[in-house]
Swiss-Prot record:
The lineage of its organism: Bacteria, Bacillati, Bacillota, Bacilli, Lactobacillales. InterPro entries: Asn/Gln-tRNA_amidoTrfase_suB/E, Asn/Gln-tRNA_Trfase_suB/E_cat, Asn/Gln_amidotransferase, Asn/Gln_tRNA_amidoTrase-B-like, GatB, GatB_C_1, GatB_Yqey_C_2, Gln-tRNA_amidoTrfase_suB_CS. It is an enzyme of class 6 (ligase). It comes from Lactococcus lactis subsp. cremoris (strain MG1363). HAMAP family: GatB. Allows the formation of correctly charged Asn-tRNA(Asn) or Gln-tRNA(Gln) through the transamidation of misacylated Asp-tRNA(Asn) or Glu-tRNA(Gln) in organisms which lack either or both of asparaginyl-tRNA or glutaminyl-tRNA synthetases. The reaction takes place in the presence of glutamine and ATP through an activated phospho-Asp-tRNA(Asn) or phospho-Glu-tRNA(Gln). This is Aspartyl/glutamyl-tRNA(Asn/Gln) amidotransferase subunit B. GO terms for molecular function: asparaginyl-tRNA synthase (glutamine-hydrolyzing) activity; ATP binding; glutaminyl-tRNA synthase (glutamine-hydrolyzing) activity.
Amino acid sequence: MNFETVIGLEVHVELSTNSKIFSPASTKFGGDPNSNTNVIDWSLPGVLPVMNKGVIDSGIKAALALNMDIHKSMHFDRKNYFYPDNPKAYQISQFDEPIGYNGSIEIELEDGHKATIRIERAHLEEDAGKNTHGTDGYSYVDLNRQGVPLIEIVSEADMRTPEEAYAYLTALKEAILYTGISDVKMEEGSMRCDANVSLRPYGQEAFGVKTEVKNMNSFSNVKKALDFEVARQAKILRAGGEIRQETRRFNDKTGETILMRVKEGASDYRYFPEPDVPRFEISDEWIEQMRASLPMTATARRAHYINDLGLSDYDARQLTATKEVSDFFDQAIKFDTDPKLVSNWLQGEVAQYLNSEKKELHEIGLTPENLTEMIRLISDGTISSKIAKKVFIELAKNGGSAEEFVKKAGLVQISDPDLLLPIIHEVFAKNEQSVADYRGGKQNAAKALVGQLMKATKGQANPTVAQKLLYQELDNF
């Protein structure tokens, strides 16, 4: 029997607010255990949560970016469960009135196939702390993450392959990243994904029994976990067995999913309205204010780059892969620089440098101003492309003005024939055999002479001018 795969994803996105959702403690990633905490995070008797308005702002932006309806009147709920990293023994979340509902996002697969994935809901909640199990036999609780604001985005079960799930995550990350409400870095835990997967015979409308898969720290691991889980369930069903509703953990070393626990239902959490957080009324004016603050989406930027700036689809996609690079590009072309040249540098030397140094664009000295200044120096013949690579390294490491560095370092390209001719004659004198070979019909000998000329000028000779002069002198020698 053949089965159809049914996949739904629950994605937790950590919001980039300076303070926590109900506490004034910092949300900064890292730091010593329990250093970014407050009495509210510790859940001391008598303390009350205070809502961070910026979290609701971010929730509205996310809902707008995902084409969602917004609950104009909403409240928070208590989700009750006991665990050491949850000192209150309940989590403040949203149950029946999430901030956003009935959304959608378009995905595109590698083969160009497009599909629309519906989004059931997006609700705001607080994160839990973190347990660490030491080798000394003790378990330790770090509450730095306790109370960090999250938005959980729950898709409908519209995905039918692991590839579609991967494409959905890619599109979702891009949509959220461009709102500016989160950096969506899976490696730092600011984007986490749980997958619900089930199988059903083709033609059957009812869903099969689902399993939830956790502990996937990359998009590729989500795909691997789904591939394994689909195969595991299919094997059980074909053998006449039954699938249990359970939670499983993905082991990235073995590529397998492992049973964690039998899955709880919503009733197990005994949701009820949170009495210490008031109901919030979201006005149309508030929504429109958030809409006006949203930057141009990645999709809109790609269309602008292709239709207005003449870039290729490939270039447009590379530039919009991260908002930081896209913002940098947009600033750079304001300096009246050829968009294609800026694009080439960002995709070439800049990307290579960032990869090798394991840094992000804002962490180096390169700016839209000094990059475009350097490109102009290439275009007007002041420096060669080869010298520009040296200039770029200097700018990346130390910042500053490209023009000032070129002058200070003596890297200005030599284009004056009166300066080049004596050097050319000196090269001929030192390489008489190569000159004789060229005059004897060996055209490649001239290339060796060009190389010697560039060496003699330490790469500062204008290649076009130098080569033209050298050939003229060879023919007249």
